[in-house]
Amino acid sequence: MTDRILIARIGAPHGVKGEVRLFAFGEDPLALKRYPLTDESGARRFKVQSLRAAKDHFVARLEGIADRNAAEALTNTDLFVPRDALPAAEDEDTFYHADLMGLRVEDQSGALLGTVLAMHDFGAGDVLEYTPEGGGRTLLLPFTKAAVPVVDVPGGRIVVVPDTNPDETPPEDADQA
């Protein structure tokens, strides 16, 4: 497991006074004001001075960022927080996405299907992306209890029901062609 968790990404500047668009990845975006944030290398530290909601993101003022040029230089900077600064998972069905990366993907019989590559949220719920064991293009599954009935982080695996994969499900009218 990683000792730092990706918690937000800085977007483009907002206005001319150094504010930035901020895309938060946690359940409580306002908690970003409490966390010790760093860039990916851990060398640069950030403190959120103010945070307000916008359409599909937040607008943040970061300590030491006073103008648009300074804000622009931070565009696409990922913000990380130390794992020990985050709350523990509340139940067995709560995970940090970082803990799922690299887990073995198995079917219900235990056959290896691939490896977890990424988690995505396109607006309709989390989607799991995995690399197939035999190579080829990555596959996507909805990250639901029906499609992913077992998540065993300590055991290094997840169990999936492959026929819930939209990429492998034929269209409803496929047999009418």
From Swiss-Prot:
Q: Does the keyword Lipid metabolism apply?
A: no
Please state every residue range assigned to the domain named PRC barrel: 92-166
Q: Which SUPFAM superfamilies does the annotation name?
A: PRC-barrel domain, Translation proteins
Give one GO biological process term: ribosomal small subunit biogenesis
* Cellular location(s): Cytoplasm
Give the record's family classification.
Belongs to the RimM family.
Which protein are we looking at?
Ribosome maturation factor RimM
Q: Name one Pfam family in it.
A: PRC_RimM
Quoted from the entry, the domain comment is: The PRC barrel domain binds ribosomal protein uS19.
For this protein, the record's InterPro entries field holds: PRC_barrel-like_sf, PRC_RimM, RimM, RimM_N, RimM_N_sf, Transl_B-barrel_sf
Q: How does it assemble?
A: Binds ribosomal protein uS19.
What is the annotated role of this protein in its UniProt record?
A: An accessory protein needed during the final step in the assembly of 30S ribosomal subunit, possibly for assembly of the head region. Essential for efficient processing of 16S rRNA. May be needed both before and after RbfA during the maturation of 16S rRNA. It has affinity for free ribosomal 30S subunits but not for 70S ribosomes.
Give a yes or no for keyword Chaperone in this entry. yes
| Keywords for this protein | Chaperone, Cytoplasm, Ribosome biogenesis, rRNA processing
For this record, the Gene Ontology CC terms, alphabetical, are: cytoplasm; ribosome
Q: Name the HAMAP family on file.
A: Ribosome_mat_RimM
**GO terms, molecular function:** ribosome binding
